[in-house]
């Protein structure tokens, strides 16, 4: 069975790679600036900034771009961004959480609501679908970081809660509040991670057919194209057959 991560790969293959990369860099830079403004500009002293910089590096964001985003936080004309979470239902009753960093709540809310409505879904109140997800930390290592056994051992020692080792890499999860310490201990043993972030993991999945899957794909794509939207999470599940049809 498959879900959002595979859909993101499909979207990136179908879209213009340069445009996708530019959009990703813009969102990463915004998160870095907000993190630096809220705490120390030194990643070693600011856990949120450290995670933001690490993710930027994993996406091959140039060092100059990262440093520029950090320096922007100390400028007098830097925008004030609010962290906002939207929740609602998409096609097929799929629960969706949207995280945004915005300098205009009205604009972002209007755009998100319009995207849901156009897709045949509905934007709800905060908390309307959040209970279907758990907020956790996710740390991803490339396959060459170690064997399944060695990574499992390192993860247990670091205080992680679960490890899934596959051909594509090692996916380590931990409690939301422990991600800073767990990732730091893992780095000492396994080296630099490919990705370190907090996510909303669904507790239950909603199976969808190809038609509904296409509608969800379009909705997620529309949401992620919005400059204010940082992350989109959904609890849909598609069969391997449907995923193959979408990938064609």
From Swiss-Prot:
Disulfide bonds: none annotated. GO terms for cellular component: cytosol. It is found in: Cytoplasm. Coiled coil: none annotated. Its main location: cytoplasm. Keywords: Cytoplasm, DNA-binding, Transcription, Transcription regulation. Belongs to the TACO1 family. This is Probable transcriptional regulatory protein BARBAKC583_0163.
């Amino acid at each position: 069975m498959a879900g959002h991560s595979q859909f993101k790969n499909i979207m990136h293959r179908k879209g213009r790679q340069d445009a996708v990369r530019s959009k990703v860099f813009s969102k990463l830079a915004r998160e870095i600036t907000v993190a630096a403004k809220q705490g120390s500009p030194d990643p070693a002293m600011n856990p949120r900034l450290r995670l933001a910089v690490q993710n930027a590096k994993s996406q091959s964001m140039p060092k100059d771009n990262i440093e520029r985003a950090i320096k922007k936080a100390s400028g007098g004309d830097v925008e004030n961004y609010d962290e906002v979470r939207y929740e609602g239902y998409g096609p097929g009753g799929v629960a969706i959480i949207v995280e945004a960093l915005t300098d205009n709540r009205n604009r972002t809310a209007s755009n998100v609501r319009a995207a849901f409505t156009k897709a045949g879904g509905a934007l709800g109140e905060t908390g309307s679908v959040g209970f279907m997800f758990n907020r956790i930390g996710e740390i991803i290592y490339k396959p060459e970081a170690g064997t399944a056994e060695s990574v499992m051992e390192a993860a247990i020692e670091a205080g992680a809660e679960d490890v899934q080792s596959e051909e594509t890499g090692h996916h380590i999860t931990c409690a939301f509040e422990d991600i800073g310490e767990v990732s730091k201990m893992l780095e000492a043993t396994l080296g630099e991670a490919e990705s370190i972030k907090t996510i909303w993991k669904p507790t239950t999945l909603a199976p969808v057919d190809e038609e509904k899957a296409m509608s969800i794909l379009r909705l997620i794509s529309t949401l992620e194209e919005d400059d204010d939207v940082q992350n989109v999470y959904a609890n849909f599940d598609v069969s391997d057959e449907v995923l193959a049809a979408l990938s064609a």
